[in-house]
Amino acid sequence: MHGTRSVLIVDDEVEIRHALRLLFEIEGFTVVGEAADGDAAIDLASELEPSFIVLDYSMPQMNGAEAAQEIRKVLPASRIVAFSALLDTKPAWADAYLNKDRITELMPLLRTFIR
């Protein structure tokens, strides 16, 4: 597994992935990869073994819940943050949840897992 500050970003919107990458890099996290759908997320998570996975719920081909279930099989220790505009509460498949409208709260949330 990469360092405790390694992140895989999974979102079908390139603008969201770009904004998250910038935010993570400014905060000293290492973005080890980006994926636009659940299938790619599973492959990259298995290959890169990130500490954190920021995972959108609504994506083409495979949603975040389905992807998280597969990722958990190979990386049970990785922390998955559900990052979605569609969900109102933390889903069972995630370690934490954050609405996309509250992006500024993402870094404090991740830091709680590092401590």
Give residue spans per PLM region.
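Conserved phosphotransfer cores of two-component systems
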Residues: S46-L48, E70-S78
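Active-site beta3 strand of CheY-like receiver
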Residues: L48-V54
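Receiver (REC) domain active-site loop signature in two-component systems and cognate sites
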Residues: M59
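Non-catalytic signal-transmission and effector/linker regions of two-component phosphorelay proteins
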Residues: M1-S6, T104-R115
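Two-component/phosphorelay signaling modules centered on CheY-like receiver
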Residues: V14-G33
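Acidic catalytic/metal-coordinating carboxylates
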Residues: D37-A40, N63-A67
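Active-site residues of response regulator receiver
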Residues: D11, D56
